[in-house]
Amino acid sequence: MRVVVIGAGVIGLSTALCICERYHSVLQQLDLRVYADRFTPLTNTDVAAGLWQPYLSGPDNPQEVEWNQQTFDYLLSHIHSPNAEQMGLALVSGYNLFREAVPDPFWKNMVLGFRKLTPRELDVFPDYGYGWFHTSLIIEGKSYLAWLTERLTERGVKFFQRKVESLEEVARGGADVIINCTGVWAGALQPDPLLQPGRGQIIKVNAPWIKHFILTHDPERGIYKSPYIIPGIQEVTLGGIFQLGNWNEINSTQDHNTIWKGCCSLEPTLRNARIVGEYTGFRPVRPQLRLEREQLRVGSANTEVIHNYGHGGYGLTIHWGCALEAAKLFGKILEEKELYRMPPSHL
């Protein structure tokens, strides 16, 4: 059976790995391929700061709560493993800051040690009157994609650099199952009026004295439009740009100045930090992520398609739960083709 995953960001590679781990032993003739025109370090995943944190408001789809939890638990289970360094995985603590009180987030019991800030802590951030502190995880996209690629290569997965023009093209090429993980570019393969780019721009700096993340929130301006500072394994990410519908991949001087001014106001010592890089990427914004099966009619044959895209700015936060769900959908396809019998549920 030939399975083609389109897309080599965190969604595509994690989905491919989930399918390999669950079905390679029962499908001896599994021919799994990854098609993409961009591989690491040129994907949107490479641009992401990598902090595990969902949106503040609860998702419309209750399954997304479970997928977020599954991802956090999966990453946390690796935190003391020999793989953690290669994955770009580490614990990180920090602050979410607000001008005034807001409800607790739905994920407060997923992270470690969630609590409200004390008055003394808020004195450190005089422009803000309310906030939270907790410990989360950082998973750096560039390292993680390299680790996933290595795991897939060990399992015999083949990678092809090519620009796919349509799902039909892949079906005609002999794919039995197509897994569409094309993120913000999914609309080029199949029209999706709900999908839009959420352009972001970030500055990477060398600032090893920054030990805590600081995320600010301004409900009036909207998500990602106020300063944030996120320390990674080697570098610190500065951001605060979100432009819906903007496809411009070129770094903007105006956006650079907005980020720099906002982050240096939040943490004045950053003025002494050396800038080591600046990047632009696109969040695949959709009212609800798309994770479902579809049958594609090509000629006289039906090709199975699993869509897994539209994760907005939280792809790294929810990726493993979505990969597990996509693998489950793949298992149902195998069962219908009488190639696999699903294990009985113990619920």
From Swiss-Prot:
Write out the ranges of the annotated region (Required for protein stability): 1-16
Chain residues that bind D-dopa: Q53, R283, G313
- Which family does the record assign? Belongs to the DAMOX/DASOX family.
| Segments of this protein annotated with the region Active site lid that may open upon substrate/product migration in and out of the active site and close to increase the hydrophobicity of the active site, to make the hydride transfer reaction more efficient | 216-228
Q: What is this protein called?
A: D-amino-acid oxidase
CC terms in the record's Gene Ontology section? cell projection; cytosol; extracellular space; mitochondrial outer membrane; peroxisomal matrix; peroxisome; presynaptic active zone
Which biological process terms from the Gene Ontology are attached to this UniProt entry? D-alanine catabolic process; D-serine catabolic process; digestion; dopamine biosynthetic process; L-leucine metabolic process; neutrophil-mediated killing of gram-negative bacterium; proline catabolic process
Q: Name the lineage.
A: Eukaryota, Metazoa, Chordata, Craniata, Vertebrata
Q: List its EC numbers.
A: 1.4.3.3
GO terms for molecular function, please? D-amino-acid dehydrogenase activity; D-amino-acid oxidase activity; FAD binding; glycine oxidase activity; identical protein binding
* UniProtKB keywords: Cell projection, Cytoplasm, FAD, Flavoprotein, Oxidoreductase, Peroxisome, Phosphoprotein, S-nitrosylation, Secreted, Synapse
Q: Which PANTHER family match?
A: D-AMINO ACID OXIDASE, D-AMINO-ACID OXIDASE
Q: What class of enzyme is it?
A: oxidoreductase
Give the disulfide map.
Answer: none
Query: How is this protein organized at the quaternary level?
Result: Interacts with BSN (via coiled region); the interaction is direct and inhibits DAO enzyme activity.
Q: Which gene encodes it?
A: DAO
Compartments in which it is found: Peroxisome matrix; Cytoplasm, Cytosol; Presynaptic active zone; Secreted
